[in-house]
Amino acid sequence: MTYSTRLPRYGDKTNSAFFEEYLQRLLEERDKSGLTDMIGGIEAMLISVEPGNSVEYIAELALMSPYEYLVTLDSEKHLTHVLRIDMNSPDILLREPKDVKHSDIFRSLNDLYPVGSRRPHSRYLGEILHCKDRHQVVSLQQQREFRFFQVGQLAELDLPLNVSISKPSPYTQNIVGYMERQTDNIRVYQHGNCIILPQAQAANDRGKEMQERLGIKDFLCPVDHLATRIYSQNREVALLEYLGLSSYYYWGSYDITDQNSSTNVTKSAHELQESRSPAKVFTANNHPYCVNHLDQLPSPTENFVRNYGPRLHHIAVEVKDGQVNGREYIDLVVDAIAGQGKGFLLETIGSRNEGLKQIFSSASDFSSLIIEYVQRFGDFQGFF
């Protein structure tokens, strides 16, 4: 049996007594129930974009990450493009509605927020997790009051039918899915007709050719972490909810005082490398927006949530640790991609002495998501 409570904790943030009590109880019960051992790492990440944007986003990801276009699943309401690195890292399922007027629960989440509503179909939906016995996992989770879409609802939402999917979280608005697969089998999604879309393949090839020409292909590694922004009051319950749905454990939290926020990290209790199952990070303000005027505190995280809704903010791609002529790989990657017209927010921060160097891109024109590049030095596993 996996013991999720015996793994080391890091960070400097103090949590409430409520959180510490229920964290221990939740993980102990999850371990004893067998759920921790039945649920594995992240199999796939689901992203939705506006009609007409998926092909250009494939080209963007082909340049900025190790992902490559594999196939397209052509179903009644969507084109779902499967992007893959290999079977040792999660897939990306990139969904594009065929009809700009298409409406579902995910669009309704965007419609609630002033900036999110401008791109009603563009959002990160959530993760699909590997599991050993999907029906048993769902049964146990339903007993613990987690709610799932019925098969008929999945068909109406035009989602893979071999995946059980939770209702969107009230705290993060993300979903969690479970997919059963023998570890030596490839991932297969029971969804639509499997085709190779010529324009998607051409976009991928264009991005990969540029990546090769710029000399950055060998510097880019799989996803390091996925960062979701949430309201300040939902920090602890969002963590508990994700730990209840997954086999992750609470790695720890750091206060980011100058930003009036905290970075809260969960990782695989099976101690899988992040390249196999990325860390899940939750960022929240330390104080709600309604009192910021009293202390004149910054509020970038809460402002984002108020504009877009609780949702994934960025996907962090790891950059291999190394230098060329005294320059870190991350600086070479950023210079090369910036030279192709991609914007970045501020400069890289951190250093080899601090253990980490990172930078954020501007939001994608095609998905609204940000790519973070992170280069860790030596065995440093922390966060800024």
Predicted region positions:
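Short, structured motif recognition centered on aromatic/hydrophobic residues
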Residues: 39-47, 92, 122-126, 223-227, ...
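Helix N-cap motif at beta-to-alpha junctions
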Residues: 50-54, 131-136, 232-234, 319-327
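Amphipathic alpha-helical segments
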Residues: 52-68, 140-144, 233-251, 332-340
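Short, amphipathic alpha-helical interface elements at domain boundaries
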Residues: 78-80
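Long, well-ordered mid-to-C-terminal structural blocks that present hydrophobic/aromatic surfaces
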Residues: 249-307, 312-317
